[in-house]
């Protein structure tokens, strides 16, 4: 194996390409939630298009590939220019988090126009050389995302709103390393921003989706967030599973046959139901003990938010049952339990929005070995971001937390068709049994 290295060619702020408002914007209740103040890191892999495809030149220097315009300009330059233009529309991203002078103790966004920290980098290898960034990673996190020193970027990481790195590989592919602050955008909002960059990179006059700030229209219930949770010391093992489209289709048909032809379920429902079943059996929990799943669902439709709202609009969905019941249930039966929890979410969200929870904080979490936290990246919109080079072959979080029992659901990387589950939810003593149970019928 060779020595793989990434060189940071240039780095510094990219500012809006035109004048933007100078103001301080308040954040919504969910934006201000203590656990959201920090950068979410992800990587987005773009392969070089097939050179064997039939190409025809365009007047602007690009080419047509299979009826689509292909950008043959350097990716870093294209993304940098489009980012500057996108920041005119999404100008809060060019600011920083500060304390709200009108509401002391609350964070707000100072729209200062300082910009987004941007890095152009080059790797001395192909994407194949580093196994297309499959785990375990053959390049470090610091190689793939911006990690500026205080001298390079004086804004503290938890107060920075976005950082972007474009790393080109010798094969012609490139990787976008993204860091966005969860305090200003959930996954859907961050993907909306990056799709806007892609729209402008492809030559559209403006983003297809008009951004809406409107945090003042978001519910602000008189509910105090609970204390920050204690993190257990759980040395968890990392395991990846790919669920083929055929397997998912088979179980969807089984669920419809059991629940009724009008009832449908998603790939997400299936993979987390199977995870819940297999993990519960593998850890051999006390049959009477409660085993739990928690994931966040979009509340945009429930709360009637406008299209283009890019702040946090999520609400927790919590599923709990006795370990003995979960272990004895089929995957299809557990899909039904998950679907029922999702059905209840709208009512629970509205009760929270109206302050009718008796002071209880539904976002309060307890981290223990009996609980698994699920993050769904499969439908956020990152897989649709196109800078003129086509959609990414894979897009997902850079690292998973090895202290919290958690899993990531995402699209399987191309050319696979199906769903990938990245699990960090069992200790070493349970890992082999868990993996065997998960894979026993994935054919």
Swiss-Prot record:
Instruction: Name the coiled-coil region(s).
Output: none
GO-annotated molecular function: hydroxycinnamoyltransferase activity
Q: What happens when the gene is disrupted?
A: Reduced seed mass.
Q: Which UniProt keywords apply?
A: Acyltransferase, Transferase
For this protein, the record's Gene3D superfamilies field holds: Chloramphenicol acetyltransferase-like domain
Write down the InterPro entries for this protein, in alphabetical order.
CAT-like_dom_sf (IPR023213), Plant_acyltransferase (IPR050898)
Q: What is its EC number?
A: 2.3.1.-
Q: Which residues form the active site?
A: 182, 386
- Tell me the domain of life: Eukaryota
Q: Does the keyword Acyltransferase apply?
A: yes
Which PANTHER family is this protein grouped with? ACYL TRANSFERASE 10, ACYL TRANSFERASE 4
Similarity annotation: Belongs to the plant acyltransferase family.
Additional information: The gain-of-function mutant OsAT10-D (T-DNA tagging) shows significant reduction of ferulate in leaf cell wall and strong increase p-coumarate in young leaf tissue but no discernible phenotypic alterations in vegetative development, lignin content, or lignin composition.
What is the purpose of this protein? Involved in the incorporation of ferulate into the cell wall. May act as arabinoxylan feruloyl transferase. May function as p-coumaroyl-CoA transferase involved in glucuronoarabinoxylan modification.
| Name of this chain's protein | Acyl transferase 10
């Amino acid at each position: 194996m060779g020595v793989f290295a990434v060189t940071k060619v240039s780095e510094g702020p990219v500012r809006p390409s035109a004048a933007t408002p100078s103001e301080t914007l308040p954040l919504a209740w969910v934006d201000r939630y203590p656990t959201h103040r920090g950068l979410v890191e992800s990587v987005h892999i773009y392969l070089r298009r097939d050179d064997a495809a039939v190409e025809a030149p365009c007047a602007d220097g690009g080419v047509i590939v299979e009826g689509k315009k292909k950008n043959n300009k350097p990716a870093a330059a294209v993304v940098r220019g489009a980012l500057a233009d996108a920041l005119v529309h999404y100008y809060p991203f060019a600011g920083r988090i500060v304390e709200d002078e009108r509401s002391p103790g609350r964070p707000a966004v100072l729209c200062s126009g300082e910009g987004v920290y941007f890095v152009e980098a080059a790797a001395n290898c192909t994407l194949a050389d580093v196994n297309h960034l499959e785990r375990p990673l053959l390049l470090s996190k610091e190689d793939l995302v911006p990690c500026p020193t205080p001298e390079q970027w004086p804004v503290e990481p938890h107060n920075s709103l976005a950082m972007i790195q474009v790393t080109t590989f010798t094969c012609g592919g490139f990787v976008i390393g993204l860091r966005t602050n969860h305090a200003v955008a959930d996954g859907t909002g961050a993907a909306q921003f990056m799709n806007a960059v892609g729209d402008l990179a492809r030559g559209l006059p403006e983003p297809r989706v008009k951004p809406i700030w409107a945090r003042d229209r978001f519910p602000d219930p008189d509910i105090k967030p609970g204390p920050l949770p204690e993190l257990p010391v759980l040395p968890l093992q990392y395991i990846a599973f790919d669920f083929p489209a055929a397997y998912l289709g088979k179980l969807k048909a089984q669920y419809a046959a059991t629940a009724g032809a009008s009832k449908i379920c998603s790939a997400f429902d299936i993979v987390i139901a199977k995870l819940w079943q297999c993990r519960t059996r593998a850890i051999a929990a006390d049959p009477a003990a409660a085993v739990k799943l928690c994931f966040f669902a979009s509340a945009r439709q429930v709360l009637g938010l406008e299209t283009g709202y890019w702040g946090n609009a999520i609400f927790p969905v919590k599923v709990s049952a006795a370990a003995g019941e979960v272990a004895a249930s089929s995957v299809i039966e557990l899909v039904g339990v998950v679907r029922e929890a999702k059905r209840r979410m709208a009512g629970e969200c509205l009760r929270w929005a109206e302050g009718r929870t008796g002071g209880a904080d539904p976002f309060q979490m307890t981290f223990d070995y009996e609980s698994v936290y699920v993050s769904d990246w499969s439908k956020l919109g990152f897989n649709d971001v196109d800078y003129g080079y086509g959609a990414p072959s894979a897009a997902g979080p850079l690292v998973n937390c090895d202290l919290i029992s958690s899993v990531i659901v995402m699209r399987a990387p191309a050319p696979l068709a199906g769903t990938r589950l990245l699990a960090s939810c069992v200790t070493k003593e349970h890992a082999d049994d868990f993996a065997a149970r998960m894979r026993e019928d994935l054919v």
